[in-house]
UniProtKB/Swiss-Prot annotation:
Cofactor(s) essential for the protein: Mg(2+)
GO MF annotation, one: magnesium ion binding
InterPro entries the UniProt entry points to: Streptogrm_lyase (IPR011217), Vgb (IPR051344), WD40/YVTN_repeat-like_dom_sf (IPR015943)
Family in the record: Belongs to the Vgb family.
Database matches in PANTHER family: VIRGINIAMYCIN B LYASE
Effect of residue 18 to F: 600-fold decrease in catalytic efficiency
Gene that this polypeptide is encoded by: vgb
Active site positions: 270 (proton acceptor)
Swiss-Prot/TrEMBL keywords: Antibiotic resistance, Lyase, Magnesium, Metal-binding, Plasmid
Protein name per UniProt: Virginiamycin B lyase
Length: 299
């Protein structure tokens, strides 16, 4: 396959694009932790900015709920944020100080689930703002990204515990150790094969875990690529950012990893998502990248 790589400039400089997601209407939403705001890129390319009420909130990851609202984590402000469909920003302070919320996703019943890096907890927040937290079994696990699995449980990475965690709606937690020692798992996503896929930022591998907990690992060709985030693409392809190598990686259906260099030097790619046709990724260098299929060599 051949892909066209494009890089889009943002309105302002030194804004720190980090998390990224796409709505079902094709709008691209990004967090900008240095500028303390969230931006939305419309289909016509127009950018709408949403400055956060809390200064220096360090907004990190975001997700779009099934009812079209944008939810996000304010890592330094210790809050969960929300942009309603009318564009109103609401913030919810976590019960415990310095919890450092990070990853975020929607659960099976519409609640929003998130990780607390410093708090060593998994949290959930209801539509009316009620928060409940679940302590992890091991101290200092540093839970990072979180995603909904095909089994309707929430799956998350434990960056410092070298494990993949699973939590049910009732709060039951199971942990699965990663074979590679000190692998530093970060991003995780549900694949189109119904398994969970994750990246190992230190182990330099892509991991796959089944709902039963069976783990397989795939080595990234470029040393010290420092993979950060991962998303499911077309078919059963997986796409991921290589923060250290300045590349975008693709794990194909036959378990081959292909890599696509980013044009600009030191792009620092972080978040990544797929809208059904295009791979979008956020770069700390104040650009948004997109990869579009232009030729399928199988045809």
């Amino acid at each position: 396959m051949e892909f066209k790589l494009q890089e889009l400039n943002l309105t302002n400089q030194d804004t720190g694009p980090y998390g990224i997601t796409v709505s079902d209407k094709g709008k691209v939403w990004i967090t900008q932790h240095k500028a303390n705001m969230i931006s939305c890129i419309n289909l016509d390319g127009k950018i709408t900015e949403y400055p956060l009420p809390t200064p220096d909130a360090k907004v990190m990851c975001l997700t779009i709920s099934s009812d079209g609202e944008v939810w996000f984590t304010e890592n330094a402000a210790n809050k969960i944020g929300r942009i309603t469909k009318k564009g109103i920003i609401k913030e919810y302070t976590l019960p415990n100080p310095d919890s450092a919320p990070y990853g975020i996703t929607e659960g099976p019943n519409g609640d929003i689930w998130f990780t607390e890096m410093n708090g060593n907890r998994i949290g959930r927040i209801t539509d009316d703002g009620k928060i409940r937290e679940y302590e992890l079994p091991n101290k200092g696990s540093y839970p990072s990204f979180i995603t909904l699995g095909s089994d309707n449980a929430l799956w998350f990475t434990e960056n410092q515990n070298n494990a993949i965690g699973r939590i049910t709606e009732s709060g039951d937690i199971t942990e699965f150790k990663i074979p590679t020692p000190a692998s530093g798992p970060v991003g995780i996503t549900k694949g189109n094969d119904d398994a969970l896929w994750f990246v190992e930022i230190i182990g330099n591998k892509i991991g796959r875990i089944t709902p039963l907990g069976e783990i397989t690992e795939f080595k990234i060709p470029t040393p010290n690529a420092r993979p950060h985030a991962i998303t499911a693409g077309a078919g059963i392809d997986l796409w991921f950012t290589e923060w250290g190598a300045n590349k975008i990686g693709r794990l194909t259906s036959n378990n081959i990893i292909e890599e696509y260099p980013i044009q600009i030097k030191s792009g620092e790619p972080h978040g990544i998502c797929f809208d059904g046709e295009t791979i979008w990724f956020a770069m700390e260098c104040d650009k948004i990248g997109k990869l579009t299929l232009i030729k399928d060599n199988m045809e």
